[in-house]
Curated annotation (Swiss-Prot):
<keyword id="KW-0689">Ribosomal protein</keyword>
<keyword id="KW-0496">Mitochondrion</keyword>
<comment type="similarity">
    <text>Belongs to the mitochondrion-specific ribosomal protein mS23 family.</text>
</comment>
<dbReference type="InterPro" id="IPR016939">
    <property type="entry name" value="Ribosomal_mS23_fun"/>
</dbReference>
<feature type="region of interest" description="Disordered">
    <location>
        <begin position="211"/>
        <end position="262"/>
    </location>
</feature>
<dbReference type="GO" id="GO:0005763">
    <property type="term" value="C:mitochondrial small ribosomal subunit"/>
</dbReference>
<keyword id="KW-0687">Ribonucleoprotein</keyword>
<comment type="subunit">
    <text>Component of the mitochondrial small ribosomal subunit.</text>
</comment>
<dbReference type="GO" id="GO:0003735">
    <property type="term" value="F:structural constituent of ribosome"/>
</dbReference>
<feature type="compositionally biased region" description="Polar residues">
    <location>
        <begin position="242"/>
        <end position="251"/>
    </location>
</feature>
<protein>
    <recommendedName>
        <fullName>Small ribosomal subunit protein mS23</fullName>
    </recommendedName>
</protein>
<dbReference type="Pfam" id="PF13741">
    <property type="entry name" value="MRP-S25"/>
</dbReference>
Length: 262
């Protein structure tokens, strides 16, 4: 058969040969159709090569879609840039139509059925800029101060409610800050143990690499003698006729006892 398989192109010829040799009593129903509309003769689709245009200009951005921006985008960037920890608070991001903020009355920052968050500050700022004709900075300060006041009030309510519940016997587990501090303490203690091991290994390696005489005497060597040992040394030297640590290296005659150590 070689490199190419031509049997699909010869299906009609094969069917006619089988009919002529009377191996098939009838021609297939598609025989006339394939004869009127024969299959393509090319085995591979040719590669479409576009001519290379020299000195072509840069493609125009006329048909490039413009970025979709909203007026609230810059306000959100300013608020969450100043309050990055607000992004760590859990919040509901599911919306029905994308215009849920338009269903609230933003003449006040607190809305029934909506959690007080950064989006409340953004929408309140937009309302002040539109209806009170305030500047961007003034509206931002006003909305931010209202947000701080209500957030502080909510935290006081939650703290008092917790204290009242604990007073009547309720028990609350550890908070996220306490759990985080415990994990940090464990990591710190593990790091200290690892650091001590590394320091000991480094000191041992340096001691092995040092080939000279160490200035520091080993423990127990070079320390002061006890009183008994000193007396024994004095008596031993007295027998030799000299006593150390005495003025003018006093020479003791034979038969004379050495002075006792004070």
């Amino acid at each position: 058969m070689g490199r190419y398989d031509f049997r699909p192109l010869r299906v009609r010829q094969t069917a006619k040969a089988l009919f002529d040799s009377k191996r098939n009593p009838n021609l297939p129903q598609w025989y006339e159709v394939v004869g009127n509309i024969p299959p393509g003769e090319t085995l591979a689709r040719p590669i479409l090569r576009a001519p290379k245009v020299r000195h072509a200009r840069k493609a125009s951005k006329l048909f490039k879609p413009l970025p979709i921006t909203y007026a609230e985008d810059k306000l959100r960037s300013d608020f969450f840039g100043d309050h990055p920890w607000e992004l760590a608070r859990p919040r509901l991001i599911v919306e029905d139509s994308g215009n849920d903020a338009k269903k609230y009355d933003w003449s006040k920052i607190v809305q029934p059925g909506k959690q007080l968050d950064g989006e409340s500050v953004v929408q309140r700022q937009m309302w002040l800029m539109k209806h009170r004709n305030l500047s961007k900075a003034s509206a931002y300060d006003a909305a931010r101060q209202e947000f701080y006041a209500h957030r502080h009030r909510n935290e006081i309510r939650a703290r008092i409610a917790k204290e009242e519940a604990q007073y009547v016997g309720a028990y609350f587990g550890k908070g996220p800050l306490e759990i985080g501090m415990e994990l940090e303490d464990k990591s710190w203690e593990a790091w200290k143990r690892w650091a001590n091991v590394q320091i000991e290994d480094e000191q041992a390696m340096r001691a092995q690499m040092f080939s000279g005489q160490s200035d520091e005497a080993p423990e127990g060597e070079g320390s002061d003698m006890s009183a008994g040992e000193y007396d024994m040394a004095v008596e031993e030297l007295a027998g030799q006729g000299s006593i150390p640590n005495t003025p003018q290296s006093t020479v003791v005659p034979e038969g004379t006892s050495a002075p006792a150590h004070a």
